[in-house]
Curated annotation (Swiss-Prot):
It comes from the Bacteria. Pfam families: Ribosomal_L19. Keywords: Ribonucleoprotein, Ribosomal protein. One of its GO terms (biological process) is translation. It comes from Syntrophus aciditrophicus (strain SB). GO terms for cellular component: cytosolic large ribosomal subunit. This is Large ribosomal subunit protein bL19. Belongs to the bacterial ribosomal protein bL19 family. GO terms for molecular function: structural constituent of ribosome. The keyword Ribonucleoprotein applies.
Amino acid sequence: MNVITMLEREQMRGDIPDFRPGDTVRVHIRIIEGQKQRIQAFEGIVIRKKGGLSQASFTVRKISYGIGVEKTFPIHSPSIDRIDVVTRGRVRRARLYYLRGLQGKKARIKELRKV
């Protein structure tokens, strides 16, 4: 194993839950404004998960006041306080870009049921 890979493994976080595209997640982000620090939640559907060791990222999409908002987060970012999986979705694609063109009830994702 080379030196760069070893350094990347040290920087990685171990408290990340297992989630996939189609899942609804709540990402708690640590925001620093001047001397103050607060935590803001961003809840939406995971439309993409990009691999890699320390460069892994995921994109979350939500509808805010009728406008679609997408944010891409690095998985191992120190500014992410925690990630909560709200619901598991059942999809057959790895990239859910088709949700961008859908509105209302057509943009719903089936919930994965445990049997």
